[in-house]
C-alpha cells in the first residue's frame, strides 16, 4: 500500500516507518525537520519531505494517511495554547483538505477524556473534524508510549516518565522530580497506563491493513495502571540502580489517573513495564 506518515521522524513515526517498510509498504514521510541531520527514518523510506502540515496546499493521494504530526506536551500547551490549536486542529484540517485517501488514521490521546489542558482540547477538536470530513477513518487514543527497538535516537527534550527515570538510572540526571505526592492514589503519585512503542506501531499497521473502523476511537493501552513510584521501583529492580527522587508541586494540566477503559482489538500486547524500563535504560546508557 502507498502510505503517508506525518511526523515521520518522531518517536512513534520512526518506529512505524521502519515496520511498514519491512512489510513492503511504500512509505512516504513528512516532518518539519525538528530533528536536524539526525533523521530517524532515512534508512527506512526513500520519500522523506520537509513539510509543515499547517502550511501546504499541494494535492496528494495515498491509500492511507497516518497523521502523527502535532504538538504533544501538556504543560507547554498551558503556556502557549494557540500554537497547539493551530498545529493540532488546523494541521489536521489542512491534511483532510489536501490529501485524498480512503483511510485517515489519527493519533489522539488518553488526555481527551479529562480535557484538562489545551493539548487535550485540541486533540478532541481534531477528532471531530476527522469524523466530519474523512472518507474513512480510524481514531486512536494513545496512552503513555515508551520503549524502543533501538532505531530511535530520541533527540530533543522528551520528558515522558520512563525516559526521565532511565536518565537518572543511567547517571545522566542526579534526581527524578515527581510532580506531586498528594494525589488521591495508593501512594499519592499519579497513575498512568504504559504501552510499548512497538506494540503500538504494530496496532497501527493492523488498522491500516484491516481498513477504517469509523468508530469513535480505538484505545491503545494495556489496562494496567502504575503509579510514578511503582515505575521508579520497577526501574530500580531491572537495572539494580537506586533512583533518588524529589517531590515538587503538581504540574498544571496533569490529571490524577489515566488507564485505558477498553483495549482495542487491534492491539496485541507483547511487552511489559519491565521491558519498557530495560529498553529505555539501555538506550540512555548507550547514547
Indicate where each model-derived feature is located.
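Short aromatic-enriched loop/helix-cap "lid" or pocket-rim segments at secondary-structure transitions
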Residues: 39-42, 149-154, 190-191, 231, ...
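C-terminal substrate-binding subdomain of Rossmann-fold SDR/epimerase-dehydratase oxidoreductases
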Residues: 167-287
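Alpha-helical scaffold segments in soluble metabolic enzymes
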Residues: 94, 164, 206
Amino acid at each position: 500500500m502507498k502510505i503517508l506518515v506525518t511526523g515521520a521522524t518522531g518517536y512513534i513515526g520512526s518506529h512505524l516507518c521502519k515496520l511498514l517498510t519491512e512489510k513492503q509498504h511504500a512509505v512516504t514521510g513528512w516532518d518539519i525537520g525538528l530533528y536536524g541531520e539526525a533523521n530517524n527514518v532515512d534508512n527506512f523510506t526513500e520519500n522523506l519531505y520537509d513539510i509543515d502540515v499547517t502550511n501546504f496546499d499541494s494535492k496528494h493521494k495515498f491509500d492511507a494517511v497516518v497523521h502523527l504530526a502535532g504538538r504533544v506536551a501538556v504543560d507547554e500547551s498551558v503556556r502557549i495554547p494557540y500554537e497547539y490549536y493551530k498545529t493540532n486542529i488546523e494541521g489536521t484540517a489542512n491534511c483532510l483538505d489536501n490529501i485524498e485517501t480512503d483511510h485517515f488514521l489519527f493519533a489522539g490521546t488518553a488526555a481527551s477524556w479529562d480535557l484538562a489542558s489545551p493539548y487535550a482540547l485540541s486533540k478532541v477538536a481534531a477528532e471531530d473534524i476527522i469524523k466530519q470530513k474523512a472518507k474513512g477513518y480510524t481514531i486512536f487514543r494513545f496512552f503513555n508510549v515508551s520503549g524502543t527497538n533501538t532505531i530511535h535516537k530520541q533527540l530533543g527534550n522528551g520528558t515522558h516518565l520512563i525516559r526521565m527515570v532511565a536518565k537518572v538510572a543511567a547517571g545522566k540526571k542526579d534526581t527524578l522530580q515527581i510532580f506531586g505526592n498528594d494525589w488521591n492514589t495508593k501512594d499519592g503519585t499519579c497513575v498512568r497506563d504504559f504501552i510499548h512503542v512497538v506494540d503500538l506501531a504494530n496496532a497501527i499497521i493492523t488498522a491500516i491493513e484491516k481498513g477504517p473502523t469509523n468508530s469513535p476511537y480505538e484505545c491503545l493501552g494495556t489496562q494496567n495502571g502504575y503509579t510514578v513510584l511503582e515505575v521508579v521501583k520497577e526501574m530500580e529492580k531491572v537495572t539494580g540502580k537506586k533512583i533518588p527522587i524529589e517531590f515538587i508541586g503538581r504540574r498544571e494540566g496533569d490529571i490524577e489517573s489515566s488507564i485505558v477503559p477498553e483495549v482495542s482489538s487491534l492491539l496485541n500486547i507483547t511487552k511489559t513495564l519491565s521491558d519498557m524500563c530495560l529498553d529505555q535504560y539501555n538506550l540512555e546508557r548507550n547514547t
